[in-house]
């Protein structure tokens, strides 16, 4: 769905080659689209973990971002009607987008706990943070401000406690919204 981008397998092969050459790599899993769910994230994170110990940078799609319309157009041209419908809902309803983005952030962090040596650094959008309050806003702000743990940085590489799921496995995030 990314116009002019190399296929995912080509990107993965390039990352694998770099990793094998001893170059520290990170993966941008950004942006993720609303039809993506737990199984999709598990598959992606499995590929990324196969590269070794990597940092995955994650951000749900933002309907205000420049690439949103490109993705919508690409989905329409590819005939992905279910994706088009979902993206339209994300674009048309602020509350729908907030709930979708929170669910995506939470699901990715939950799935990431299944993989040793895989750090996911989430990027909640400023508008998402502003659209929340209380404990949830505090948690999202902490996630935003956490330093990503790339091993080539001068900071220790332990996973940041701020970069964790919003709710535990099987627990709904509805009580936080």
Which residues are covered by each model-predicted region?
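Conserved AdoMet/S-adenosylmethionine-binding subsite of the radical SAM
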Residues: 1-100
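C-terminal accessory extensions appended to soluble enzyme cores
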Residues: 71-177
């Amino acid at each position: 769905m990314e116009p002019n981008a190399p296929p995912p397998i080509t990107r993965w092969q390039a990352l694998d080659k770099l990793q094998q050459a001893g170059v520290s790599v990170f993966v941008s899993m950004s942006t993720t689209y609303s039809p993506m769910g737990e199984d999709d994230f598990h598959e992606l994170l499995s590929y990324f973990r196969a590269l070794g110990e990597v940092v995955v940078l994650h951000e749900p799609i933002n309907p205000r971002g420049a690439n949103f319309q490109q993705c919508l157009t690409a989905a329409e041209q590819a005939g992905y009607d279910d994706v088009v419908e979902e993206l339209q809902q994300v674009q048309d309803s602020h509350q729908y987008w907030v709930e979708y983005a929170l669910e995506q952030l939470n699901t990715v962090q939950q799935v990431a706990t299944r993989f040793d040596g895989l750090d996911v650094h989430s990027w909640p959008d400023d508008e998402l943070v502003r659209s929340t309050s209380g404990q949830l806003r505090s948690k999202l702000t902490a996630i935003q401000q956490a330093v990503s743990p790339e091993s080539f940085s001068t900071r220790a590489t332990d996973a940041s406690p701020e970069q964790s799921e919003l709710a535990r496995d099987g627990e709904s995030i509805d009580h936080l919204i």
